[in-house]
A protein has these predicted regions:
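Carbohydrate-active catalytic/glycan-binding domains of CAZyme proteins
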Residues: 1-543
Length: 543
């Protein structure tokens, strides 16, 4: 076997590192391996943990929130749930600090620990005195510090926040000692100084923070101090990373919420969130990007010579032939379409519940039985749905309703509602839906601003209805294709023949229309009478 040649510095990686909804990245390193975690909001399992040995190729190795006893998100509002985690490693133990927002059960800031970043992770240690959101942990010798952001008690302007710091006692699981106010941001009038991270480099302690809100005005600023408690002096060049001055036609926008890591060769790198709008619409949510960092005059400089997040960049110098071979992936991503068959082993995500709570056996790895709980996907309820992130501006998601199911516990009048959806929230979605009650019908449904409308509808023939009611194979084919981030083409059919089709504007799935903090998710679902459902087969995501 021929050896993989060492990469030359002319080879490039392509941003984003993690496509689709992967916001608020936080990164750390243990030995030769980097670990990265993202926000997941109302989706479970929560807080995906990725690993990499070269900062370019990332593998999903687990999730931090995997058990109902860790956290109950069943009541989470749209774009509520798990906000802005921080991952750190200290003396062989991994920590994640996070905040649960907009839920009826235990909420607020907490931390969890694990001996391995792959898990299992502990139950949360809640910190009721840790006000606000976006916590971070910083280790300085024997001291463990907890920082977060909150609204200023007497703000000078709307949206003014402050970064605060306090010692953490991990034995007692509580904050202790005096509280220190570190910073209110670099620019007066800029909202939401948030997402703080602390570092020690050379003689200084550094505070990195986002500000401007996680939209068009998003930015990264930095301050430094001689002591971790301050006082902090802002960089005269703040903000040190932003695309807000590039205008609305920029390919990469909303840059912010960065975290830094040092590689084994001494080089520094940043991960940050950003968006890739198409036709002024953001469907994919906020994604994870990479940039090199240099130090000049004791200040970090992001992507020296350019000062912005690159769409591509040089492969890190510490990447060796061995790490390239171990990744088993090309350094340059192929532009050719990729077809991904989805089955039980897919890392599905579910809003307000765990996928395993809904997923049943169906005879093979590429078939899934999905029974309704009675909850609906167009309400903030823990409905039976299995989703994957929409990660490309041109992509397709398809599934076949192979046959209907009825639980022995289901009785009385029943309605079966099963299908596929592209959803940004319960109030913003497009669905291709099979409805079976007194007749069998296929609907194409659009939900915009919480208002549902049936775009197209077609009754199926009596023979198909009889097969469906009897639980016999029916082969109802459902497909949605996003076309260049502008249009969603919906097609439904049987035996390869199209029964219904419609082209709908994709705007309903965008952040610009729906608001919130998440990206679009493609799902199979069941939301009829509790105990009814379907076996889904031929589930595919392709781009």
């Amino acid at each position: 076997m021929s050896k993989v040649p060492a990469p030359e510095q002319s080879l490039t990686f392509t941003n984003p590192l993690l496509e689709g909804m992967h916001p608020d990245p936080s990164i750390c390193r243990q030995g030769d391996t980097f670990y990265l975690v993202n926000s997941t909001f109302e989706y479970l399992p929560g807080l995906p943990v990725y690993a990499s040995t070269n900062l370019v190729h990332w593998d999903l190795i687990g999730h931090a929130i995997t058990r109902p006893e860790q956290l109950d998100l069943s009541s989470a509002r749209a774009s509520g749930g798990l906000f802005a985690p921080t991952i750190r490693e200290h003396n062989g133990l991994f920590y994640i600090a996070c905040t649960a927002v907009g839920v009826d059960g235990p909420s607020g800031s907490f931390y969890i620990t694990a001996a391995s970043a792959a898990g299992p992770w502990s139950n949360p240690v809640w910190l009721p005195d840790a006000a606000g959101i976006d916590p971070t942990i910083f280790f300085d010798g024997d001291d463990i510090w907890w920082a977060g952001c909150r609204q200023v008690a007497e703000p000078e302007y709307e949206g003014q926040t402050e970064i605060w710091l306090q010692r953490l006692d991990p034995v007692e699981g509580r904050l202790t000692g005096p509280e220190h106010i570190l910073w209110t941001g670099a620019v007066k009038g800029a909202i939401w100084a948030e997402g703080p991270h602390l570092y020690k480099h050379g003689e200084y302690f550094y505070l990195l923070a986002a500000e401007g809100g996680t939209g068009d005005n998003h930015a990264v600023s930095v301050a430094r101090a001689n002591h971790v408690t301050g006082p902090y002096l802002g960089n005269p060049r703040n903000p040190v990373l932003t695309h807000r001055n590039f205008g609305g036609t920029a390919a990469v926008q909303c840059v912010g919420h960065a975290d830094l890591v040092q590689a084994t060769d001494g080089s520094w790198w940043a991960v940050a969130l950003a968006t890739r709008p198409r036709h002024s619409l953001t469907l994919l949510g906020r994604e994870t990007f990479l940039a090199p960092v240099a130090w000049e005059n004791d200040w970090p400089v992001f992507n020296p010579g350019l000062g912005c997040l690159p769409e591509s960049g040089k492969v890190p110098a510490f990447v060796t032939a061995e790490t390239v071979a171990a990744a088993e992936q090309p350094l340059i991503t192929s532009p050719n379409p990729v077809r991904r068959v989805l089955g039980r082993d897919e890392p599905w995500i579910t809003a307000r519940g765990f996928p395993a709570q809904h997923m049943g056996e169906a005879g093979s790895e590429n078939r899934i039985a999905l029974l309704s709980t009675g909850a609906r996907v167009d309400r903030t309820e823990p409905a039976a749905a299995l989703g994957v992130r929409l990660s490309h501006h041109t992509a397709a998601f398809a599934a076949t309703v192979e046959r209907l199911l009825r639980s022995p516990a289901a009785g009385g009048p029943m309605q079966t509602l099963v299908g596929i959806s592209l959803s940004q929230s319960p109030e913003s979605q497009i669905r291709a839906e099979l409805s079976v009650e007194k007749a069998a019908r296929i609907d194409i449904v659009e939900v915009a601003g919480g208002v549902s409308r049936i775009v197209e509808s077609r009754n199926l023939d009596d023979e198909t209805f009889d097969r469906l009611v009897a639980g016999e194979p029916a082969g109802i084919e459902l497909r949605m294709a996003v076309l260049d981030g502008a249009t969603v083409r919906v097609e439904t059919g049987t035996d390869g023949a199209v029964v219904l089709s419609a082209d709908l504007p994709a705007r309903v799935l965008s952040t610009e229309a729906a608001g919130g903090f998440v990206g679009a998710v493609a799902s199979v679902y069941s939301m009829g009478t509790a105990g009814t459902g379907a076996v889904f087969a031929e589930m595919v995501y392709e781009h």
